[in-house]
């Protein structure tokens, strides 16, 4: 093919095509079909403009011989074939002198007679498919599109073909000649299919032997052989009526394609019921930290030593009492468990040498809280397969819950800035390859925007707790180990700080499978009075354990300190993902990068610096009942991060289902906004699939309510 291109096209065209490919890092020797396509496109652009001039009266004329009359002006400005910078310079100067709207993408020609840019397409497929792809890409009323095919068909905007019959016939003849020349050399099939990105390998080898028999066995019903099936598939025209296609495929399918209009979608139905409750593995906005600055005590970095040191910074402990009981639990046991923790920490201090880990005494309250001996005895299946009425436990349907306002508050808090930095600059990780300059600049800007974010604190807290719990689960399977919940950060002045949120006591943890559960009791400090939103704390027993002096604008005030206690559980696989929560930083960084890329491609230069440093510009963050919310680029970074972190903290099957199904509806609505006239069938079924995931999960319910806000504003 490469030889053919060099023989068939003018050397100037070949040179321009090579240059264009090199600019995009493509190799003409390897991507030969692309090489041929670029040459063909260049030649069509040049032929389009050849011999067309504008005379002194401004009329369009065709001059074929080298007329010495110098007053003629070329009718078309050729943009295709110039290097990008030069091409944009030409486009800008045309726009400045004629007042024509600047196109988003580089067009191929400018027509001085009709005063419009022209996009030329040459396709090996059907012209109207290619025309639609072009129109969708450039999305501009102003740029005129003209498509030619190798079979002599053409299509142009509003059937306005710009040139006279004869000029277009010259182009069609040339394309037909190229096609015949390729075909005579056996190059045409590969060239024709490469546009669709089809793989042409299988035409060159036959499937034989076992593979052939397997292929014949695995055909859909009613097909006798692979050939028979292949012929059927090849007969599928890619365009045409979907209903017809479906009925061709199966007699049982009768889908009516309904147009999807602004009035079609309805809001998602959120469940009724009592308000949903907090289900995260640790407290988020309600957490309270006991902290030490610039820790330098003996054994600093050993969690138990750090925890004891943090506990000693607080002097307001008092006799604990229950202020919000857990509806279903034996509440005195929760109270006894906390007293036991205090007593055993006191015992440690009385010892000569503080141990590195602490295993709690297996008291009755801890055995109850950790579900010790509660699991039904496992019986070998062999011993009971003859029992006639052997059946699984009936499990109750989960109770439907309604959306509560606390989860939106949790999310807002996660987007806020704290006064400490939770990650160092290199936390997102160096690139393995020699990292490009731009990528590291972006990473540093992004890190600066999110290092103080509360969502980042949740990441580090999650990583710490899951790592500690997984370690203890493997190292001390039978013990009720006491695990402090710790995080580390830096203050504004750059001083190190160690924080204690509370404690976890883990139960027996013989985790053979990824999904085997380890129970734990969490006890977390807080200043939030649980009686303000009792529904949020349904799964907790809350004790009042002390009084804390807080500095406020009016001086010192004393506030009760609470301890939120609950039984919880997790598994190896959940802890493994919890340890990987730093990935949320990477995910949100990639989302921001794609925004920068989009901006840069419009402006034709790298926009990283402007993107982060132009403080006046606002960006869309999300939808609320008030409309589209906007904010600074930092706010966008933190919101994307918080979403990613909440997807991790509140991961659940309901979220998986909701994300997958609602995305389909989202794409349909976006297609409607882009005027692509989407059609749907069984929209009711899609709504059912989405709504069956809306049961009781706070994060899913919040996302569904955001989705409804989006629907309202998108369809106005």
From Swiss-Prot:
Binding note for cofactor: Binds 2 manganese ions per subunit.
Alphabetic keyword roster: Cap snatching, Endonuclease, Eukaryotic host gene expression shutoff by virus, Eukaryotic host transcription shutoff by virus, Host cytoplasm, Host gene expression shutoff by virus, Host nucleus, Host-virus interaction, Hydrolase, Inhibition of host RNA polymerase II by virus, Manganese, Metal-binding, Nuclease, Phosphoprotein
Primary localization: host cell
Cellular location(s): Host cytoplasm; Host nucleus
Cofactor(s) required, per the database record: Mn(2+)
Domain of life of the native organism: Viruses
Main EC class the enzyme belongs to: hydrolase
One Gene Ontology molecular-function label: RNA binding
A GO CC term attached to the entry: host cell cytoplasm
Keyword set includes Manganese: yes
PTM annotation: Phosphorylated on serines and threonines by host kinases, including human casein kinase II.
Residues bound to Mn(2+) 1: 41, 108, 119-120
Intervals of motif Nuclear localization signal 2 (NLS2): 184-247
Record-stated family: Belongs to the influenza viruses PA family.
Subunit (UniProt): Influenza RNA polymerase is composed of three subunits: PB1, PB2 and PA. Interacts (via C-terminus) with PB1 (via N-terminus).
Role noted for this protein: Plays an essential role in viral RNA transcription and replication by forming the heterotrimeric polymerase complex together with PB1 and PB2 subunits. The complex transcribes viral mRNAs by using a unique mechanism called cap-snatching. It consists in the hijacking and cleavage of host capped pre-mRNAs. These short capped RNAs are then used as primers for viral mRNAs. The PB2 subunit is responsible for the binding of the 5' cap of cellular pre-mRNAs which are subsequently cleaved after 10-13 nucleotides by the PA subunit that carries the endonuclease activity.
Name by which UniProt lists this protein: Polymerase acidic protein
